[in-house]
Amino acid sequence: MFPRDARLDMYDPELAKAIAAEVMRQEDHVELIASENYCSTLVMQVQGSQLTNKYAEGYSGKRYYGGCECVDIAEQLAIERAKQLFGADYANVQPHSGSQANQAVYFALLQPGDTILGMSLAHGGHLTHGANVNVSGKLFNAVQYGVNGQGLIDYEAVESLALEHRPKMVVAGFSAYSQKIDWARFRAIADQVGAYLLVDMAHVAGLVAACVYPNPLPHAHVVTSTTHKTLRGPRGGIIVAQAPQEALVKKLQSIVFPGIQGGPLMHVIAAKAVAFKEALEPAFKVYQQQVVKNAKAMAETLMLRGYKIVSGGTENHLMLVDMIGRDVSGKDAEGALGQAHITVNKNAVPDDPRSPFVTSGLRLGTPAVTTRGYQEQDCVDLAHWIADVLDAPADATVIAAVREKVAAQCRKYPVYR
């Protein structure tokens, strides 16, 4: 029997200390990593529930284990809410991550050696879109497209590559691209060569749900996403589609289970259901609108301070700061900002002369600070402090002064009140 009042700090003080330190770090540091956010206490409550004890291989009503009648309800709630959120006719909420959701789609619709056309990691794509260090670039013949001199997706080049290589699948989506994507143009390109169009909307799913970013579902054969990032749920993945053919649904269902996964994580699926319910609330749309306003304010301020933003600004939640030609690298900038309690990630930029472990860029995003309650002026102030550090990354006095300002801002906007 397990006592309900058991204390981790008494049983495992080393682990309890690490968790407490992380809680403090999240409160005392400004989080600007574009893929990170804070989920609600309700999401965390469900994720830590007794549902973690239940094995439930299969799907609702068709399990390989008994005693699944309660978790069936949780999974069905997640499915129906995901469909409502994105205007989907099909949803699979079992993928453990966005990467596994992408992997499922590849394995469902492609054969090893087939050609895929995806966005280059160096130009803002994702590892799972055909990078040669990822399984997607090892099992498939991955052809990569990128951005033009203005930092925008070159649709004519994408079309030319598609006509030349005749891919079986075109992949649209990104991890570091700050403009809107023309999903219809991508579908037209895919149709020209008889390819599937897979859209990975992991970074913008929350914006899509709130109708502040174009919805890819009317154009894509299949759409994948994470459930954290802008969607502000637990770490996990989903696959959704609008009006899919029955054969496609069967392939997707059978590849997720039993194809690449066994038992689903029912505590995470239930937490997804809570997050989807939160995303259906009117306040979520207001939040996503503010995410974009804050990102625009930050990007504009950094440009006023002389820093180049790839593509000249942002239309979503993130921006990529291009520091090619400057003495400071992305790695050094990340470290200096970290000392000021501003958390960012180094990121390659188009035509980056530095290695991926050093880089000449920074990726910044506003989902987490907006969850805290930041408004445009807060992000303007924050952008100025970032520029102060980037202007003098080795100046301890500057870093200390910024750290004090960050501390005051964090006290003003606690994550969990």
UniProtKB/Swiss-Prot annotation:
Instruction: List UniProt keywords, sorted A-Z.
Output: Amino-acid biosynthesis, Cytoplasm, One-carbon metabolism, Pyridoxal phosphate, Transferase
Query: What is any Pfam family matched here?
Result: SHMT
- Chain positions recorded as (6S)-5,6,7,8-tetrahydrofolate binding sites: 121, 125-127, 355-357
**An example of a Gene Ontology BP annotation on this entry?**
glycine biosynthetic process from serine
Annotated GO MF terms: glycine hydroxymethyltransferase activity; pyridoxal phosphate binding
Give residue numbers for the modification (N6-(pyridoxal phosphate)lysine).
229
Segments crossing the lipid bilayer: none
Q: Which family does it belong to?
A: Belongs to the SHMT family.
What does the UniProt record say this protein does? Catalyzes the reversible interconversion of serine and glycine with tetrahydrofolate (THF) serving as the one-carbon carrier. This reaction serves as the major source of one-carbon groups required for the biosynthesis of purines, thymidylate, methionine, and other important biomolecules. Also exhibits THF-independent aldolase activity toward beta-hydroxyamino acids, producing glycine and aldehydes, via a retro-aldol mechanism.
UniProt name for this protein: Serine hydroxymethyltransferase
Q: Which organism is it from?
A: Xylella fastidiosa (strain 9a5c)
